[in-house]
């Protein structure tokens, strides 16, 4: 082998080495599942009740309220938010968002009751319980690592989830801890007649029954910022199926 050939081979090895060491989406996601507690621990979870407080920032000042989220396998969800808007001249606010696995409905004391928009329904169908990372392939969703970005001072893998229907989701997975620390997706806002991009940060992870749960979430968009602080998480609670359905 001539010196020129050896040099060319050496440069080729250097060129391909970074690509060979790059992690695939499957590897990153599986490490994230492990960091969150593992598949076996998640398999034990059939339902979850999360309670806490919510603060919504508005031009007129912060709105403080309570939030309850009930989840049940495989993808049922109910979110109940209550807040006092008397300081804004609007009285009590109650938003009861229900999804029974195939359709969704919102009971809203401020803006009126309504069916969920199709894009939101699709998003909830893709958000399987106890975690969407566990079976996204079974739902026909593809995933790929699109690079690395900073989330605050943390390096994070950016994994793009592309479902067969519904909005794409970008998950930012900490490159050291492998915990999912940020999510970006577009949400349909019928009141505005358009979609907006919403960023959600997952903070303050704590162990509950062998699973890592974020106890603080910060959501931001061009129209609204909110913070949810979790006070209690209960697994395998008794579920009233009627809470997921549209009231008759």
Where are these regions (language model features)?
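N-terminal mature ectodomain segment of secretory-pathway/periplasmic proteins
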Residues: 27-112, 140, 144-145
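Short amphipathic beta-strand/extended segments with alternating polar/hydrophobic composition
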Residues: 64-67, 92-99, 114-121, 173, ...
């Amino acid at each position: 082998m001539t010196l020129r050939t050896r040099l060319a081979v050496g440069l080729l090895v250097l060129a391909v080495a970074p690509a060979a060491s790059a992690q695939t989406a499957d590897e990153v996601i599986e490490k994230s599942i492990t960091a969150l507690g593992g598949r076996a621990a998640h398999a034990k979870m059939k339902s979850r009740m999360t309670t806490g407080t919510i603060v919504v920032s508005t031009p007129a000042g912060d709105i403080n309220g309570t939030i309850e989220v009930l989840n049940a396998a495989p993808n049922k969800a109910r979110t109940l938010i209550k807040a006092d808007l008397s300081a804004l001249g609007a009285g009590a606010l109650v938003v009861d968002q229900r999804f029974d696995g195939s359709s969704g409905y919102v009971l809203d004391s401020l803006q009126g009751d309504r069916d969920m928009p199709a894009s939101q329904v699709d998003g909830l169908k893709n958000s399987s319980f106890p975690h969407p990372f566990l079976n996204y392939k079974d739902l026909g969703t593809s995933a790929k690592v699109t690079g690395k970005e900073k989330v605050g001072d943390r390096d994070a893998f950016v994994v793009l989830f592309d479902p067969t229907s519904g909005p794409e989701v970008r998950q930012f997975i900490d490159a050291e801890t492998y915990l999912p620390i940020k999510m970006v997706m577009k949400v349909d806002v019928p009141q505005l007649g358009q979609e907006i991009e919403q960023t959600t940060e997952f903070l303050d992870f704590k162990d509950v029954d062998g699973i890592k749960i974020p106890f603080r979430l910060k959501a931001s968009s061009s129209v609204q910022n909110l913070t949810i602080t979790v006070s209690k998480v209960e697994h395998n609670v008794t579920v009233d199926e009627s809470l997921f359905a549209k009231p008759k």
